[in-house]
Amino acid sequence: MKKIAVLTSGGDAPGLNACIRAVVRAGHYYNCEVIGVRRGFKGLIEKQFISLTPRDVGGIIDKGGTFLLSAREDRFLEYKYRKIAANNIREEKIDGLFVIGGNGSFQGAYLLSKEFGIPIIGIPKTIDNDTYGTEYTIGFDTAVNNAVDAIDKIRDTSESHERVFVIEVMGRKSGFLALAAGISTGADVTLIPEYPFPMHVIVKSIVDALNRGKKFAIVVVAEGVASAKEIADILNEKLKPFDFGGVRYSVLGYIQRGGSPTSYDRIMASRFGVFAVEEFMRGNRDFMVALENGKILSKPLEVSFGRIKKPDLKDFELNNILTI
């Protein structure tokens, strides 16, 4: 009987519990003992291990967050603490460590493999959808829906008071979330770091809309471009000659990371989790699960390191076409 362990690391994302559930149940289906590691890499260092049965993960597929908890653990940057973690894994006789995480989590786990020979299986999750090597990461669809729901509500106020609203969404240095939310809500301007607009072009877009008789507008901005307040302040100054309700801004913040996962995230998390276990049982090691051209497959873990994943230029052009 093989023994596997699963942890969640880094920022939470909707669908983590669905993925944990899939790993645990697939593990038992293939006659593995399954260990849960609480609080991510911190739990590896402090040996926060719990046994997980199929019943332990019942009723969690619809829950946001991660019932195993997560933490950012700076100690893991130091070799001596990685060695402690590796020794704990060996003492527990764990044959494979399943890491549900993003770029940083994969790089940390990769060191366990290279320095100590710990077999690593990476399952990508982040609402930013910026993990290189996979078209999809767990949590993205729910985050987009959360952002769209909030922007739709703000639009009601924007239209009622004839205001321009600048709405900041998450994504770090990536524009996937902002672009998807912008297209889905019919935003007048969508700003992402990968395809930047000069400020005068942004102002012109809003001015053109006001000149066409429009009295309100929605600007969606990825946090990696600038703060919503900075852009709102500039627009307020530039748009003073126009008769409308002024410019306001809103930062959606952590609401995007929470809540019950969408059906799509539950399905993808389940598929990723089961595929990861099946690949492990076939003898594959040190890989990440990926979605490519609609198919789930495995890639070397290091594929995701140091490379930038960009939104499809066609989607960006689509957004621009639809904002006339």
Swiss-Prot record:
Binding positions (substrate): T126, I127, D128, R163, M170, G171, R172, E223, R248, Y254, I255, Q256, R257
Residues reported to bind ADP: R21, A22, V23, V24, R25, R155, G186, A187, D188, R212, K214, K215, F216
GO biological process: canonical glycolysis; fructose 1,6-bisphosphate metabolic process; fructose 6-phosphate metabolic process
Ways its activity is controlled: Allosterically activated by ADP and other diphosphonucleosides, and allosterically inhibited by phosphoenolpyruvate.
A Pfam family that the UniProt record links to this protein: PFK
Domain of life per record: Bacteria
Location(s), subcellular: Cytoplasm
GO cellular component: 6-phosphofructokinase complex
Known cofactor(s): Mg(2+)
The protein's Enzyme Commission number: 2.7.1.11
Any GO molecular function: ATP binding
Reactions that this protein is recorded to catalyse: beta-D-fructose 6-phosphate + ATP = beta-D-fructose 1,6-bisphosphate + ADP + H(+)
Residues engaged in binding Mg(2+): N103
Active site (UniProt): D128
Entry-linked InterPro entries: ATP_PFK (IPR022953), ATP_PFK_prok-type (IPR012003), PFKA_ATP_prok (IPR012828), Phosphofructokinase_dom (IPR000023), PKF_sf (IPR035966)
Keyword terms: Allosteric enzyme, ATP-binding, Cytoplasm, Glycolysis, Kinase, Magnesium, Metal-binding, Nucleotide-binding, Transferase
Pathway: Carbohydrate degradation; glycolysis; D-glyceraldehyde 3-phosphate and glycerone phosphate from D-glucose: step 3/4
Residue positions binding ATP: G11, R72, E73, G102, N103, G104, S105
Keyword Transmembrane attributed: no
Subunit structure, as described in the record: Homotetramer.
Role description: Catalyzes the phosphorylation of D-fructose 6-phosphate to fructose 1,6-bisphosphate by ATP, the first committing step of glycolysis.
Homology family: Belongs to the phosphofructokinase type A (PFKA) family. ATP-dependent PFK group I subfamily. Prokaryotic clade 'B1' sub-subfamily.
NCBIfam families: PRK03202.1 (NF002872)
Protein name: ATP-dependent 6-phosphofructokinase
